[in-house]
Amino acid sequence: MTLPRGPLVLVMPEAKRLHVTEAARQEGWFAASSSSSGPFLVITQSFGSVVFILGAAFFAALVRGFAGFGAALIFIPLASAAIGPREASPILLLVDMVLTTAMLPNAWRFANRKEVGTMAAGAIVGVPAGAAILAWAPATVLRWAICAIVLLLLAFLISGWRYHGRPRPKYTAGVGLIAGLFSGAAQLGGPPVAAYWLGGGHEGKIVRSNIILYFAISSVFSFVSYLMGGLIGWEVLAIAILAAPCYALGLAAGSHLFGFASEKMFRTICFVLIAISAIAGMPLLDGLFG
């Protein structure tokens, strides 16, 4: 996807001055720093790319707030088309980790922590493997794989399939392994986990708490794996900081819109939006946006 180029200047609240080298200016690179020798918050992407990412963050959060799921299914294909999958996944991870922290106390209180721990044991193997794929696979191959996985997961969600029966440790760990692999590679681990626990016979409050607590733990695994793999740098951090308010606004707006449509209607709308995002994110369509 070719987006309009132009300078983007990021000035952090504590920044004392803006440092722009001539070489960086020629490349459209801008860096904000609190001191001449301190670490830089750098954005090398064009202004159009960053605006597109912020829009994708709002759009994804709007759907999540509206339907309770789907943020990664929308954000990852779109953001990957703009800046690449190696940047898109860490950005969503950082934003989501920060904005869901407030949900943890209640989740810890009501979750079945033994089951969550069992699933996390599978994720501790799956997440690093997925992160390794994200770090080493060619970007174009990753984008095709992400779009294909999103469409497959969408078909899975539309089918309405649920695991029926009490969760068993070997199944729980296996789902954690698969979800961890998807999360490490593209932050797409939600559908397998939700499908498994939603049909497991637990109360809705417990299921929701299990999911929140599990993803808090798997997010830590992803963060460590991404950090060790060199996938979280100053540019990712800078864009995540910019995207966080848009994501928060989207969540609030989506929650507000929830009462204005029937369950069938809003699920249909969300499924359509996910499909559009997956198709729009395909490398085959990059030339259409140039």
Pin down the residues of each PLM region.
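Transmembrane helix exit motif
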Residues: 100-108, 131, 136, 145-170, ...
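A helix-boundary/kink motif common to multi-pass secondary transporters
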Residues: 84, 138, 262-266
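Cytoplasmic-side transmembrane-helix entry/capping segments in multi-pass membrane proteins
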Residues: 114-122, 145-147, 167-176, 208-212, ...
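Membrane-interface helix termini and inter-helical loops of multi-pass transporters
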Residues: 43, 132-140, 226-237, 286-290
